[in-house]
Amino acid sequence: MATELKEYLVIIPDLPDVLAKRQVLLKPHNQDAAPLVKAGRVPFFGSTLAHHSPEGQQVAENGTVMIIKAESEEEIREIIRKDIFTIEGVWDFGKLSIWPFKIARMRNRRDNSWVVQKFGGTSIGKFPDKTSSDMLCTKFRKESLRNNEQITADCQELLDYTSAAKRFNLDINGKAKDKMVSFGEKLSCRLMVAMLRDRDIPAEYVDLSDIVPSNNLDQLKPEFFHEAAAVFGKRVEACNGRVPVITGFFGTVPGSLIDSGIGRGYSDLCAVLVAIGLHAERVQIWKEVDGIFTADPREVPDARCLPSITPSEAAELTFYGSEVIHHLALSLAIQAKPPVSIFVKNVQKPWGQGTVVVPSDGDDTSSWPIDYLDPSDSDSTSSTALPKMPTAVTIKRDITIFNILSNKQSMSHGFFVKVFTILAEHDISVDLISTSEVHVSMAINSSNMEPSQIKNVQCRLSEEGEVNVLPDMAILSLVGAELKNMTGIAGRMFAILGEQHVNIEMISQGASEINISCVIPDKDATRALNMLHDELFTKSAI
């Protein structure tokens, strides 16, 4: 008679400092475990940033987490030593922790263990087409009659809205843009609710487009986000066990959601606000790429997916051209109590490693979410310390440089005040700046500026001095938390560009010391990006 196998949760801590440093590459788990995985003896094999025992004590800062089916704890230890790990010294077997899985599962989760998943419009557009043959069945076709009426009504409302705007020649202001943008997300959410219900998953459509109480604020303030998070959380909790399918568009936002300081990527912010309101464990940002890369893989074929990144690094990459995570979403997620962990995953490869945004050594981790990664969060377990390296390199295009030489009719502080007052009058933000007492160079994102607007700004600035405008430029940025500890990295970066005859118009290094940027001609941007990545990432990693 066969002995019944029991499920055990097993945690094997890594040796000190293996994962503590930023420069880490996670490799696929040991192939020796594959037969056991296929046989069902190891149904889950993943990695952990930190883990608590069922009694509440922290037992692992970093390491490997598994679910193993075995007759006893003694058999588990033999399985681990003989069948899974062949390299001694990477894992600390003396601190092996084993619990019956049912107990660990019940006691090691938060009481309110929400996970917020965000899918972009492109993902939603591809997902139904890819899976329709499996998900659309007879029941869906019957229920689709009612769903079709709702979608038709939404479409008709949008058509009426745009028709009225054309008929009466109405100006399309920020609020009108918000209204029109919201329809696409409403339609997508209704479709996803129908598809989930077809799979016998109870789902509820949640419309956040008018949920935030209207106020008289003209500008976004922290109080607005606190209020929005609380309102979102209450609305989602009202679903009472049904899966909420939420519109990424939300309102009413002071000024406008699209034209305010939020703009593109607002659905990232919405997901984080929902997570904060629910005290969720994590936010998963699902994209069409494997995670956050060392460079844009569309321009740099050798770019690698980063297993982890710090919030400050992610914010720098977002600001300087990489479409990573909305900067406000990052800021709010890290400032929340407890902070919300963020995972970036590939919607087409949900089993992939992805990238996790984790606090750096200098961040307060006392209230950071503590849990092991589930199978959808990681398929990697081992790590190898690497030499100090930058984290990523990125390009931000559509940059225009304004060089202003003071006419010396005012003191330097008065000169700068007048320059920035002119920019503020035209709602222009400066991406990079370099100054002296009588000279200032500014790199400005001109992607949304009309040529006439640039000309008007130039004319106004010419009142304060001689103005030289350089269009068609790009900001090349090297980002990494370890840059401040890499002596000579700036010189090496500029030497590489100089050797390839790439002209540098401006140089800037942030006060945080995690970013070195320069402005170069846009025509050289792709070449410069590949050269830096090849020298500082590909060759340095060999």
Swiss-Prot record:
<feature type="domain" description="ACT 2">
    <location>
        <begin position="478"/>
        <end position="542"/>
    </location>
</feature>
<dbReference type="InterPro" id="IPR001048">
    <property type="entry name" value="Asp/Glu/Uridylate_kinase"/>
</dbReference>
<comment type="similarity">
    <text>Belongs to the aspartokinase family.</text>
</comment>
<feature type="domain" description="ACT 1">
    <location>
        <begin position="404"/>
        <end position="472"/>
    </location>
</feature>
<dbReference type="GO" id="GO:0009089">
    <property type="term" value="P:lysine biosynthetic process via diaminopimelate"/>
</dbReference>
<dbReference type="InterPro" id="IPR011008">
    <property type="entry name" value="Dimeric_a/b-barrel"/>
</dbReference>
<dbReference type="GO" id="GO:0005829">
    <property type="term" value="C:cytosol"/>
</dbReference>
<comment type="function">
    <text>Aspartate kinase; part of the gene cluster that mediates the biosynthesis of fusaric acid, a mycotoxin with low to moderate toxicity to animals and humans, but with high phytotoxic properties. L-aspartate is suggested as fusaric acid amino acid precursor that is activated and further processed to O-acetyl-L-homoserine by cluster enzymes aspartate kinase FUB3 and homoserine O-acetyltransferase FUB5, as well as enzymes of the primary metabolism.</text>
</comment>
<dbReference type="InterPro" id="IPR018042">
    <property type="entry name" value="Aspartate_kinase_CS"/>
</dbReference>
<dbReference type="InterPro" id="IPR054352">
    <property type="entry name" value="ACT_Aspartokinase"/>
</dbReference>
<keyword id="KW-0547">Nucleotide-binding</keyword>
<dbReference type="InterPro" id="IPR001341">
    <property type="entry name" value="Asp_kinase"/>
</dbReference>
<dbReference type="InterPro" id="IPR005545">
    <property type="entry name" value="YCII"/>
</dbReference>
<dbReference type="GO" id="GO:0004072">
    <property type="term" value="F:aspartate kinase activity"/>
</dbReference>
<dbReference type="InterPro" id="IPR045865">
    <property type="entry name" value="ACT-like_dom_sf"/>
</dbReference>
<keyword id="KW-0067">ATP-binding</keyword>
<dbReference type="GO" id="GO:0009090">
    <property type="term" value="P:homoserine biosynthetic process"/>
</dbReference>
<dbReference type="Pfam" id="PF00696">
    <property type="entry name" value="AA_kinase"/>
</dbReference>
<comment type="pathway">
    <text>Mycotoxin biosynthesis.</text>
</comment>
<dbReference type="InterPro" id="IPR002912">
    <property type="entry name" value="ACT_dom"/>
</dbReference>
<dbReference type="InterPro" id="IPR036393">
    <property type="entry name" value="AceGlu_kinase-like_sf"/>
</dbReference>
<dbReference type="Pfam" id="PF22468">
    <property type="entry name" value="ACT_9"/>
</dbReference>
<keyword id="KW-0677">Repeat</keyword>
<keyword id="KW-0418">Kinase</keyword>
<keyword id="KW-0597">Phosphoprotein</keyword>
<dbReference type="GO" id="GO:0005524">
    <property type="term" value="F:ATP binding"/>
</dbReference>
<dbReference type="Pfam" id="PF03795">
    <property type="entry name" value="YCII"/>
</dbReference>
<keyword id="KW-0808">Transferase</keyword>
<protein>
    <recommendedName>
        <fullName>Aspartate kinase FUB3</fullName>
        <ecNumber>2.7.2.4</ecNumber>
    </recommendedName>
</protein>
